[in-house]
């Protein structure tokens, strides 16, 4: 009888440990969400990709004009996915920070990515945890990090490009260039 009690006592200690190994930390769960996002994009699986976003999510692309609601972003990406065209971004490095809130329901991240098309890229964003425990992307921003030594030349080229675009728009419309967009 003593052996049976000892066995039961040891099982009671082991079962919680085994369960803990199966339960990911919030940071691991967020990493899995982001890994799934990149895998779905590479496989052009639109439904799986967009299911990872919160309903009011925003995607900020690399062009200064690209600030898309989820609906707008779907309008851009779904035709590509429907043709089997996705995009490949492989995480090289990732940092996840969980907000110090009692709910443990908000986190932000930054990740360095290897892009099949663009080389080194960076993704940053915010995730929120739903009532059911799933992490959803509330904001994702994609950028191209520029080495500091190249920044003066590249930002100069961007400035020249924008001036040429503004001049072309002014000539074609007969209107002055628009004022810079204000953030709300």
Short names for language-model regions:
Residues 1-4:
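Positively charged n-region of N-terminal signal peptides that target proteins for export
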Residues 6-15:
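Bacterial N-terminal signal peptides
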Residues 18-20:
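Boundary at the C-terminal end of the N-terminal hydrophobic targeting segment
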Residues 22, 29, 59, 72-120, ...:
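Surface-exposed, charged secondary-structure patches
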Residues 26-45, 162-165:
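Short, aromatic-enriched amphipathic alpha-helices that serve as compact interaction elements
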Residues 43-56, 60:
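Short, well-ordered alpha-helical segments enriched in acidic and aromatic residues
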Residues 124-134:
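Short beta-strand segments and strand-loop junctions that repeat across beta-rich extracellular domains
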Residues 130-131, 138-184:
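Low-complexity, intrinsically disordered terminal/linker segments enriched in charged
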């Amino acid at each position: 009888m003593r052996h049976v009690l000892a066995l039961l006592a040891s099982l009671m200690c082991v079962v919680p440990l085994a369960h803990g190994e199966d339960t990911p930390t919030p940071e691991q769960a967020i990493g899995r969400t982001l890994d799934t996002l990149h895998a779905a994009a590479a496989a052009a699986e639109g439904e799986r990709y967009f299911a990872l976003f919160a309903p009011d999510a925003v995607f900020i692309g690399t062009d200064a004009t690209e600030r898309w609601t989820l609906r707008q972003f779907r309008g851009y990406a779904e035709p590509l996915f429907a043709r089997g065209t996705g995009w490949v971004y492989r995480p090289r490095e990732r940092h996840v920070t969980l907000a110090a809130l009692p709910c443990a329901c908000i986190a932000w991240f930054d990740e360095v990515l290897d892009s099949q098309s663009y080389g080194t890229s960076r993704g940053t964003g915010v995730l929120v945890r739903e009532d059911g425990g799933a992490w959803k992307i509330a904001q994702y921003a994609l950028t191209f990090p520029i080495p500091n030594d190249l920044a003066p030349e590249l930002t100069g080229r961007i400035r020249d490009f924008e001036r040429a675009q503004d001049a072309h728009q002014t000539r074609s419309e007969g209107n002055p260039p628009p004022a810079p967009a204000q953030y709300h």
